[in-house]
Amino acid sequence: MSSKKIIGAFVLMTGILSGQVYAGVSEHFRNICNQTTADIVAGVQLKKYIADVNTNTRGIYVVSNTGGVWYIPGGRDYPDNFLSGEIRKTAMAAILSDTKVNLCAKTSSSPNHIWAMELDRES
């Protein structure tokens, strides 16, 4: 069994057992994002994960299948932050398992800055 299938099965089982993976944007996620100045971007299929250690760049980026680019805090801004590390892990799991995500992202920055991410297995 390929590692991609194993990770996909793991993500799916974790979602089923924990009840934390929703079809569409969950009410809890919507409430969290509504408390910020960010906007919800639903049903994003991430395809690329870019980690750049160049001192002139921000560090971690994800790219969707439609070409959208988002920045994950980390690298230069919060290198040891546990929560931004969890967003990076969620992004990698979504890419490896072909699972869509819902993003809470600040659209006034370029690239858009991700503040929260939710796996969305049935979008």
Curated annotation (Swiss-Prot):
Pfam families: LT-IIB (PF06453). Disulfide bonds join 33-104. Keywords: Disulfide bond, Enterotoxin, Signal, Toxin, Virulence. The keyword GTP-binding does not apply. GO terms for cellular component: extracellular region. It comes from the Bacteria. The biological activity of the toxin is produced by the A chain, which activates intracellular adenyl cyclase. Heterohexamer of one A chain and of five B chains. This is Heat-labile enterotoxin IIA, B chain. It comes from Escherichia coli.
